[in-house]
C-alpha cells in the first residue's frame, strides 16, 4: 500500500517529518518498506505557458516555442513533442535545472536554433509510464487548468510529496486504505481523525423507482446495494485527484472511473460503476454463474465461468464478475450520462478462487479476499455520490436500493486492566487503557473492572483478548515496556529433558550417516495433505489460505521433502540425503483440538558415496536406507521388524512397514517410479517414523556389555525357498530356535536365475554364535544348527 503524506494530512494533522512518521509506524508493527520522494533529484522545475509555436526551419519534427516561465522575457525552447501547442500550460525544466537520472539542463542549439530549457513529459520527471494518463503517454504533460507561469511545477502537480510504502501482513487489511491508516496515525499521535464529506444534495426522485436489487445467493453475497446518479459529465478528473491516484500506483482514466478508484483507496471498499443505460433492464440480480456461462470482461477477453463464480446480472446476462472485473457492455464510456454505483460484500474465498483461476488480480479483488469493513460499505457509496456531484456535475437520486444484511459493525470483547498489566508488565490505570482504545477509534463500556471494547469491523484482526492486549502494547509503545527480572520460587540447574536428549541423539546419528537436516513448511496443498499419511483421517484446512500450495496442515513430512530433493537435483545437486523432525496434524471432531504428532522422515537419492580417488562409488538403495533407519533404532535401544507392504506413492515391490512391538510405527521404501519421474528424480528412497511412538517406548540408554572373553563361531547356511517368502520370515524362524547362544544373523547373498527352479530363490545367511560364560564347542553349535535347519525345512526351505 502506498500512502501519500499530502493525502494523509487531509484526515489527520501531524507535525513530524515523513521519515519520523515512518519510523513511528514501523515501531508499532506496520513495516514501512520504502519512502518515495517525488522531489528527489529535481531542481528548477516550473510551470510554463507556451505563447507561440513555430515549425523548426531545419527539422520537420521539431517546434520552436516561446515560453513564459515567469521571468521578464519569454524563453525559447525547441521541443519535439507531437502534442505541444500555443496556449498550453506545461512543465518546464529551466537552464541549470536537474531531472531524475542525473539529467542536467543546459543551453543548447538544436539544428541551429537556440533552446533554453526543456518542456517535460511526466516520464521525464520520474513518473512511471504505467500510471500516466493515456492522453500523455507519448507527449508532454499539459495542465487541464490555468496556472501561474514560474510557479513550482511539482506543487502545481501535487507531487511535492513523499509517499510511504507499507509492507503489510495479511491480518492488517485495515491499512489498505487511507482512512484505516489515518485511524492508526491518529492513535499514535493521540489526535483526532477527520472523515471526509459524504452528504450530497439529493433529488426528490428515488433510486427505488429506477432499480431493483435481488440476491439469490446470500451465503456468498450477504449484502448488495446500489445508488443512482444522473447527468454526469465525463471529463478528466481534477489534477489533485489524478496526482493522488498516480502516487498510489493507479492510472487516471476519467473523472467517473477515477472517483471509483479514489474511494477504493480512501475507504478500502471496492466500488463498481455501471452505465445505467447500458445495463439493459431495471433490475440487478446477483447469483452464482451457470456452468459454461460466458461473459466478456473489461479487458475484452471472453471468460468461461464456473458455478463457483459470483456474477452481477441484469436479470439474464452477466454485467460484472463480482469483486473481480466489470463486463464490457456496461462499462462507463465517454457518452455515459447515468451511473449506478455498486457497494457490496462478497465471499472472500469465492473472490480469491475466481481471481486466481482467471489470473485477474486487482486492487478490488485483493481487498475482497482479505475481508472488508461492513461499516464503510454504504459510507463509501455515499462518498462516491458526493464526489460525482462535485466533480462530474452529477444529480444524486435519493434512497439506496439494497438487499441482504450488512451485519454487525462492532464486535464486543471484555477485558480487564489487570489482565493487560499482568500480560505485558505495564502498570496502566483503567482510564489509561480506555484512552488508548479511544485513540484507536474503539468505543468502550465500563462495568466495574471489566472494560467492554467495541471493536469496529475494519479491524478484523482483533477477535480475542490477546489482540486487545497487543493493541495497548503497540500504542503505548513496545520501547516503554519496563525491564524486569524473572522471579523463581526455586532455582534448579539447567539440563536437557529426556525427550530433548533422545532427539539430539537421533539427529547426531543421522548427521553422522551423512544426512542433512531440513525444515519445511507445515502447510501443504489439499492434494498433498493426505499423501503418505499413516492415519487416514480428516485434514485440517485453512479458511483463508495465502495460496493453494499452502491450504492444509500436513499429515506427512514427505511431500515437502520430495519437493526439496527435486529443487536440489534441478540445480545440479544430485546427491541428496535429508531428514526432518517435525509435527503432522490430524483433525478430531468438530470443536476439538487436532492431534499434533511428531514424525521423523528422510529422503535419499543419488550417490551415497561419491567416486573419488580413494573411494568406491556407492549408490543409494533400499538396504542403505534401511541401514540408516536401523542406526536410529540401535541408538534408541529399540528393535524394529519389517513387513512387506503396499503404500500409495511407493514402489509396490520395494516397500516395507516398520514395526515396533508388533505395532506399525512407520514405513520405508522406494519412491514410485512415476512419482519420481514427475519430480525429475532417479531412484529415491524415503522413510517415515512416528517419532512420538518411538519416544514412548525407548529407554534411551543401552546397558554396558563387557567385551567377550571367549571366542565365537560362525556358520553359513544356504536356503532354497519360494521367491515370495521374505527373508525376515526366515530370520524369525532362525532366532526362535537359536537359543541364547545365537547372537545375530546376516543375509549376505540372494540369488535367482540359472540352476534354480522358476519361482525359487537362494538366500545365504550367516549365523554368529557366542557364549559369554564359556568357550563354545562344535557339538553344541552343531546341535543348535540342526534344530534351526529342521525348523527351516518344516517352513518349506531346502538346505543347499
UniProtKB/Swiss-Prot annotation:
Q: What EC number(s) does this enzyme carry?
A: 6.1.1.20
B5 domain: residues covered = 408-483
Pull one GO CC term from this UniProt entry: phenylalanine-tRNA ligase complex
What does the entry's cofactor note say about binding and number? Binds 2 magnesium ions per tetramer.
Pfam families found in the cross-reference section: B3_4, B5, FDX-ACB, tRNA_bind, tRNA_synthFbeta
Primary location group:
cytoplasm
Which keywords annotate this record? Aminoacyl-tRNA synthetase, ATP-binding, Cytoplasm, Ligase, Magnesium, Metal-binding, Nucleotide-binding, Protein biosynthesis, RNA-binding, tRNA-binding
Where is this protein localized, as stated in its record? Answer: Cytoplasm
- Coiled-coil stretches, from where to where? none
Which positions fall inside the tRNA-binding domain? 39-154
The residues covered by the FDX-ACB domain are: 708-800
- What does this protein need as cofactor? Mg(2+)
Q: Does the keyword NAD apply?
A: no
Q: Which GO terms describe its molecular function?
A: ATP binding; catalytic activity, acting on a protein; magnesium ion binding; phenylalanine-tRNA ligase activity; transferase activity; tRNA binding
Task: Answer whether the UniProt record assigns the keyword Flavoprotein to this protein.
Answer: no
Q: How does it assemble?
A: Tetramer of two alpha and two beta subunits.
- State the similarity comment: Belongs to the phenylalanyl-tRNA synthetase beta subunit family. Type 1 subfamily.
NCBIfam families, alphabetized: pheT_bact (TIGR00472), YtpR (NF045760)
* Protein name per UniProt: Phenylalanine--tRNA ligase beta subunit
Give the species this sequence originates from: Staphylococcus aureus
What gene is this protein translated from?
Answer: pheT
Amino acid at each position: 500500500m502506498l500512502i501519500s503524506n499530502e493525502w494523509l494530512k487531509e484526515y489527520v494533522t501531524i507535525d513530524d517529518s515523513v521519515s519520523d512518521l515512518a519510523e513511528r509506524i514501523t515501531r508499532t508493527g506496520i513495516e514501512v518498506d520504502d519512502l518515495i520522494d517525488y522531489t528527489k533529484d529535481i531542481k528548477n522545475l516550473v510551470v510554463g505557458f507556451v505563447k507561440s509555436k513555430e515549425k523548426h526551419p531545419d527539422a520537420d519534427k521539431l517546434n520552436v516555442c516561446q515560453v513564459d516561465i515567469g521571468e521578464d522575457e519569454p524563453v525559447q525552447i525547441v521541443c519535439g513533442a507531437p502534442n505541444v501547442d500555443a496556449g498550453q500550460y506545461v512543465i518546464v525544466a529551466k537552464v541549470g535545472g536537474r531531472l531524475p537520472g542525473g539529467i542536467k539542463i543546459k543551453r543548447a542549439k538544436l539544428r541551429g536554433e537556440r533552446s533554453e530549457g526543456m518542456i517535460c513529459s511526466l516520464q521525464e520527471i520520474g513518473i512511471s509510464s504505467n500510471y500516466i494518463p493515456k492522453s500523455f503517454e507519448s507527449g508532454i504533460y499539459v495542465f487541464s487548468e490555468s496556472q501561474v507561469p514560474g510557479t513550482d511545477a511539482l506543487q502545481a502537480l501535487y507531487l511535492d510529496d513523499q509517499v510511504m510504502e507499507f509492507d503489510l501482513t495479511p491480518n492488517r487489511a485495515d491499512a489498505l486504505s487511507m482512512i484505516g491508516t489515518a485511524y492508526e496515525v491518529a492513535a499514535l499521535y493521540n489526535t483526532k481523525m477527520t472523515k471526509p464529506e459524504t452528504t450530497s444534495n439529493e433529488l426528490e426522485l428515488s433510486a427505488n423507482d429506477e432499480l431493483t436489487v435481488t440476491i439469490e445467493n446470500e451465503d456468498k453475497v450477504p449484502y448488495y446495494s446500489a445508488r443512482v446518479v444522473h447527468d454526469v459529465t465525463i471529463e478528466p478528473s481534477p489534477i489533485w485527484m489524478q496526482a493522488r491516484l498516480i502516487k498510489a500506483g493507479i492510472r487516471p482514466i476519467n473523472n467517473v472511473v477515477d472517483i471509483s478508484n479514489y474511494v477504493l483507496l480512501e475507504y478500502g471498499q471496492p466500488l463498481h460503476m455501471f452505465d445505467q443505460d447500458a445495463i439493459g433492464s431495471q433490475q440487478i440480480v446477483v447469483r452464482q454463474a451457470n456452468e459454461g456461462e460466458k461473459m466478456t470482461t473489461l479487458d475484452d477477453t471472453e471468460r468461461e465461468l464456473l458455478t463457483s463464480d459470483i456474477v452481477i446480472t441484469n436479470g439474464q446476462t452477466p454485467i460484472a464478475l463480482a469483486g473481480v472485473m466489470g463486463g464490457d457492455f456496461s462499462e462507463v464510456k465517454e457518452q455515459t450520462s447515468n451511473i449506478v454505483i455498486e457497494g457490496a460484500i462478497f465471499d472472500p474465498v469465492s473472490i480469491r478462487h475466481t481471481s486466481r483461476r482467471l489470473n485477474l488480480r486487482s486492487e478490488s479483488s485483493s481487498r475482497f479476499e482479505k475481508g472488508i469493513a461492513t461499516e464503510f460499505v454504504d459510507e463509501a457509496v455515499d462518498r462516491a455520490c458526493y464526489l460525482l456531484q462535485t466533480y462530474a456535475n452529477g444529480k444524486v437520486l435519493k434512497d439506496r436500493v439494497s438487499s441482504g444484511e450488512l451485519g454487525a459493525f462492532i464486535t464486543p470483547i471484555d477485558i480487564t486492566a489487570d489482565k493487560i498489566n499482568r500480560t505485558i508488565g505495564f502498570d496502566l490505570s483503567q482510564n489509561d487503557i480506555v484512552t488508548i482504545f479511544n485513540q484507536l477509534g474503539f468505543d468502550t463500556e465500563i462495568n466495574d473492572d471489566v472494560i467492554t471494547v467495541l471493536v469496529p469491523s475494519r479491524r478484523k484482526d482483533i477477535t480475542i483478548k490477546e489482540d486487545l492486549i497487543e493493541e495497548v502494547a503497540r500504542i503505548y509503545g513496545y520501547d516503554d515496556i519496563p525491564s524486569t527480572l524473572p522471579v523463581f520460587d526455586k532455582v534448579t540447574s539447567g539440563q536437557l529433558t529426556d525427550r530433548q536428549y533422545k532427539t539430539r541423539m537421533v539427529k547426531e546419528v543421522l548427521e553422522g550417516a551423512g544426512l542433512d537436516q531440513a525444515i519445511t513448511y507445515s502447510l501443504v496443498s489439499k492434494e498433498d495433505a493426505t499423501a503418505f499419511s499413516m492415519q487416514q483421517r480428516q485434514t485440517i484446512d485453512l479458511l483463508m489460505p495465502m495460496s493453494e500450495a499452502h491450504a492444509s496442515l500436513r499429515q506427512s513430512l514427505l511431500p515437502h521433502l520430495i519437493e526439496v530433493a527435486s529443487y536440489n537435483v534441478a540445480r545440479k545437486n544430485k546427491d541428496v540425503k535429508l531428514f526432518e523432525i517435525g509435527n503432522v496434524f490430524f483433525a478430531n471432531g468438530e470443536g476439538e483440538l487436532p492431534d499434533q504428532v511428531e514424525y521423523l522422515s528422510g529422503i535419499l537419492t543419488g550417490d551415497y558415496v561419491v567416486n573419488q580417488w580413494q573411494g568406491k562409488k556407492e549408490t543409494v538403495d533400499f538396504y542403505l536406507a534401511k541401514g540408516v533407519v536401523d542406526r536410529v533404532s540401535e541408538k534408541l535401544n529399540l528393535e524394529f521388524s519389517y513387513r512387506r507392504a503396499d503404500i500409495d506413492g511407493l514402489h509396490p515391490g520395494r516397500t516395507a512397514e516398520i514395526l515396533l512391538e508388533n505395532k506399525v510405527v512407520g514405513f520405508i521404501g522406494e519412491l514410485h517410479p512415476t512419482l519420481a519421474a514427475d519430480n525429475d528424480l532417479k531412484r529415491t528412497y524415503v522413510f517415515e517414523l512416528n517419532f512420538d511412538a518411538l519416544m514412548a517406548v525407548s529407554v534411551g540408554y543401552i546397558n554396558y556389555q563387557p567385551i567377550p572373553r571367549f571366542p565365537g563361531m560362525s556358520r553359513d547356511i544356504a536356503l532354497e525357498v519360494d521367491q515370495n517368502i521374505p527373508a525376515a520370515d526366515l530370520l524369525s524362524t532362525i532366532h526362535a530356535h537359536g537359543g541364547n547362544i545365537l547372537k545375530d544373523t546376516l543375509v549376505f547373498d540372494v540369488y535367482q536365475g540359472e540352476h534354480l527352479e522358476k519361482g525359487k530363490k537362494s538366500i545365504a545367511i550367516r549365523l554368529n554364535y557366542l557364549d559369554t560364560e564359556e568357550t563354545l564347542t562344535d557339538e553344541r553349535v552343531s546341535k543348535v544348527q540342526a534344530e534351526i535347519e529342521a525348523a527351516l525345512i518344516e517352513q518349506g526351505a531346502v538346505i543347499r
